[in-house]
Amino acid sequence: MSKENKTTDFGFTQVPWEEKQKKVAGVFHSVAAKYDLMNDLMSFGIHRIWKKQTIAKSGVHKGDNVLDLAGGTGDLAYKFCQMVGQQGKVILSDINSSMLEVGKEKLTNKGCVGNIEYVQANAECLPFPDNYFDCITISFGLRNVTDKDKALASMCRVLKPGGRLLVLEFSKPIIPLLSKVYDEYSFKALPFLGKIITQDAESYKYLAESIRKHPDQQTLKQMMYDAGFDNVEYQNMTGGIVALHIGYKY
């Protein structure tokens, strides 16, 4: 079946393959200005701990080239700028221009200049040379990608041999009681918060649905192997609400 006739998930809705990217873009154009505030409210600030653990496992050193993919408002990119120093380079990349503008303004105001570039790009066809980056991170972005397999293969292509990919993403809770509570919170509280803070309940309804449609821990692990990564492992956080997958290129 050609992509023109294929459908894919947009939350719980099936949409034509080529329309998902436009719909996801609409979501993030809508929420970009309040994205950081909503992250703090939705996760009770815990997203900062998840990201801190991701940075700690990145293995980034001075002089490295780092790609923060789907980097949005730049939480990870800011830390990486400090870690690589002026000898290194960080590229903050996002497919969404609104998110990228918020990230650029935020990091510039924090004094992050000289060793960072901002690139609007699609994860499925990254505009970077082969074997270029020492480390790639994608934080809460992979589930929004239409062709995840193609995106993972693209990441593997631009990663240097010896480099690592870190995928921080919502996943499947491993504790049954937590799963029930999490479902109630996701489908009721998140759209309510979205309506109050951003006047956009539908975007946060999509967020809850997109999490449920994202591959579970073991499935994503195998997808990373299939894309060319080795020694893939994952760490559950907060009972599996979030998982950090790490894969290496040799």
UniProtKB/Swiss-Prot annotation:
It catalyses: a 2-demethylmenaquinol + S-adenosyl-L-methionine = a menaquinol + S-adenosyl-L-homocysteine + H(+); a 2-methoxy-6-(all-trans-polyprenyl)benzene-1,4-diol + S-adenosyl-L-methionine = a 5-methoxy-2-methyl-3-(all-trans-polyprenyl)benzene-1,4-diol + S-adenosyl-L-homocysteine + H(+). The keyword Transferase applies. S-adenosyl-L-methionine binds at T73, D94, N122, A123, S139. Pfam families: Ubie_methyltran. Pathway: Quinol/quinone metabolism; menaquinone biosynthesis; menaquinol from 1,4-dihydroxy-2-naphthoate: step 2/2; Cofactor biosynthesis; ubiquinone biosynthesis. GO terms for molecular function: 2-methoxy-6-polyprenyl-1,4-benzoquinol methyltransferase activity; demethylmenaquinone methyltransferase activity. Its EC number is 2.1.1.163, 2.1.1.201. This is Ubiquinone/menaquinone biosynthesis C-methyltransferase UbiE. It comes from Francisella tularensis subsp. tularensis (strain WY96-3418).
